[in-house]
């Protein structure tokens, strides 16, 4: 989830509007349900700067420290730096062979236990580091680990409250490249918003959502997010801005699918659990009456499966896909 885009009144100061999707009523349900969100991303306040402020005002966990890998100064014998393509359709990120397998056993933690779920989120984040750092650095893209602020209830970070009122979603804040999440909100819900546990209590679903958030970090590092945001600012219509948002979010979902495939053998994601993930992504997406900013449940399922089954970044190029697949 990206926090701070107000599509009705697009602002240069990004007040926190959490973009939500929905839990679609199944045929066996006889009552309507409240939206269940799929995560999104918050655009940077300035595309060329990363503010140094730390998230939190004492109510949230401090973000887990990041480890950076500074670029070495070029020497006489070093290879010239690559010229990176930061466009949406031909980004340098797309020229890779996919994510390598990673040893990432999850264990049997419960999504309803804060300590267990937080531990699993941070453990699997290290697995995401391993596969994405190699993929990015192989393309000449500078990588650093995102920060994490995981609470049991609510907190406040550099992009505002998390989760926001009436929301359950984790989000990525590019102002300090930190991922924020409330374990209780994600698992059990908040207010009228149902938790992911209403769909499945298997922890792999929430970890796949955190992989979506990491996908936003990948978009940030590769220049995709800045290019997307510039095009959003230049778009002259609400429908145009929403169309860009859907492609952006569905791409992050595809990247999340890539990670789950990379970890599948060790996590493990059995064929039955794979089907659980497919079912999960067929139940989240844009809900009637809410902004069409994340894509339909059918297309969320489509792009998660695309990432999981193809495991190639160019296969996640939503910017070249037909509009029918990003609606």
Task: Please provide the spans of the model-predicted regions.
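N-terminal export and membrane-targeting signals
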Residues: 1-11
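N-terminal low-complexity, Pro/Thr-rich disordered segments
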Residues: 19-111, 238-239
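Auxiliary, metal-adjacent structural segments of Zn-dependent hydrolase domains
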Residues: 123-183
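Active-site recognition of the HExxH zinc-binding catalytic motif
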Residues: 132, 181, 208-223, 252-253
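Short pre-active-site segment immediately N-terminal to the catalytic Zn-binding motif
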Residues: 190-209, 242-244
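Post-HEXXH active-site segment of zinc metalloproteases
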Residues: 220-246
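Post-HExxH zinc-binding segment in Zn-dependent metallohydrolases
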Residues: 236-264
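Pan-zinc metallopeptidase signature
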Residues: 283-327
């Amino acid at each position: 989830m990206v926090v701070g885009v107000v599509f009705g009144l697009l602002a240069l100061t990004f007040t926190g509007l959490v973009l939500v999707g929905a839990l679609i009523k199944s045929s066996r349900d006889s009552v309507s349900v409240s939206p269940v969100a799929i995560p999104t991303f918050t655009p940077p306040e300035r595309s060329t700067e990363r503010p140094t402020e730390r998230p939190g005002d004492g109510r949230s966990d401090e973000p887990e420290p990041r480890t950076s890998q500074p670029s070495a100064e070029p020497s006489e014998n070093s290879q010239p730096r690559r010229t990176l393509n930061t466009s949406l359709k031909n980004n340098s990120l797309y020229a890779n062979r996919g994510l390598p397998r990673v040893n990432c056993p999850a264990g049997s933690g419960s999504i309803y236990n804060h300590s267990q779920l937080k531990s699993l989120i941070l453990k699997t984040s290290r697995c995401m580091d391993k596969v994405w750092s190699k993929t990015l650095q192989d393309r000449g893209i500078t990588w650093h680990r995102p920060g994490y602020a995981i609470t049991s209830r609510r907190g406040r970070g550099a992009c505002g409250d998390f989760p926001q009122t009436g929301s359950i979603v984790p989000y990525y804040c590019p102002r300090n490249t930190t991922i924020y999440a409330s374990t209780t909100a994600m698992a059990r819900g908040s207010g009228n918003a149902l938790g992911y546990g209403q769909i499945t209590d298997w922890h792999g679903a929430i970890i796949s959502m955190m992989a979506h958030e990491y996908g936003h970090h990948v978009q940030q590092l590769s220049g995709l997010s800045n290019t997307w945001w510039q095009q959003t600012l230049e778009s002259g219509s609400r429908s145009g801005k929403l169309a860009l948002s859907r492609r952006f979010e569905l791409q992050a979902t595809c990247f999340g699918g890539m990670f789950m495939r990379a970890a599948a053998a060790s996590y493990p994601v059995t064929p039955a659990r794979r089907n659980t993930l497919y079912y999960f992504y067929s139940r989240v997406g844009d809900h009637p009456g809410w902004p069409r900013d994340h894509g339909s449940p059918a297309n969320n399922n489509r792009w998660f499966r695309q990432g999981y089954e193809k495991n190639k970044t160019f296969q996640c190029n939503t910017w070249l896909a037909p509009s029918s697949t990003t609606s």
